[in-house]
Amino acid sequence: MITGTYKLAGTVIRVDSLHPSVHTLCREYASEETPDFGVTVTPGDIRAEAERSARQDMPEDYLETMAVYRKIAEAMPSFDTLLFHGSAICLDGEGYLFTARSGTGKSTHTRLWREVFGDRAFMVNDDKPLLKVTAGGVLVCGTPWDGKHHLSTNTTVPLKAVCMLHRGKENEIHPVSPAEALPALLEQCYRPERTEAFLRTLTLLNTLSGTVAFYRMHCNMSAEAAAVAHAAMSAPHEPAVRKPDRVSDQSR
C-alpha cells in the first residue's frame, strides 16, 4: 500500500492506495495533520469502477483515483460536506456554482466569466467541487478531481449562488425557489449508498437550498452570457430560515 494524507474541505483524510497516481493527483492538498478518517482501495474497488465506466479501456491507476473519491464522498456527509457535479468559479471573493447535465456547457460558461472579468475571477473546481455546510453558510471547496481541463484551486470560498444552466438562443436568467431547485440538487450531488449517509445528505441539501440563491438560466456562448449571469447572481439574497440539527463550525 502507498499512503498519503490530504486535506479536503477542512477534513483531513488518509489515503491507502495500490498505485501512486492518486497521490500525484492530490499533492497540492497534502497535509501533516492527524486524519479525521481514512480510505483504503482494494482490487475489488477498482474492478467496480471499471464496471461503472462507460469506457472499457480506462487504466487501473485512473480507476483507482475515482474509487478513492467515491470512498471520500461516502464518508463526507458525516463532516457536513457533499460532493457536487458542477463548475465552480470565484469572483470578487464569492463562489458561483453552475450545474447542468453533461455536455450543456458548464465549463464553457465559467470560461466566459474568466474572459469577461479577468483577474477578478478564478476557478475553484471545474467538475466535482465539495460543498461544506457550516453554521456561517455554505462553502465551495476546491479538489483535485477537477475535470478534463484540470481547472481547480486549493481554496474554500463562500457560496453565493447556484445556477442550473440550459442552452438557449438568448441569455435569460430567473430566480427559482428552493423547492424548485431541490430536485436538480439531488440529481447533481453524490448520493451515498449507506442509508445513514444518504439521509444526512438530504438534510444538508435541505439546508443548502434554504441558504444560497438559486437560478435557472438559458444562455448562448457569448460573453454577454457571463455578464447577464453575474448581474443576477451577485444581487443581495435573503436566505430562508432553514438549519439542520447539526452543522459544522466554519472554523473547523
Q: What kind of feature is each model-predicted range?
A:
Residues 106:
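Conserved lysine of the Walker
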Residues 109:
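Hydrophobic positions on the alpha1 helix immediately C-terminal to the Walker A/P-loop
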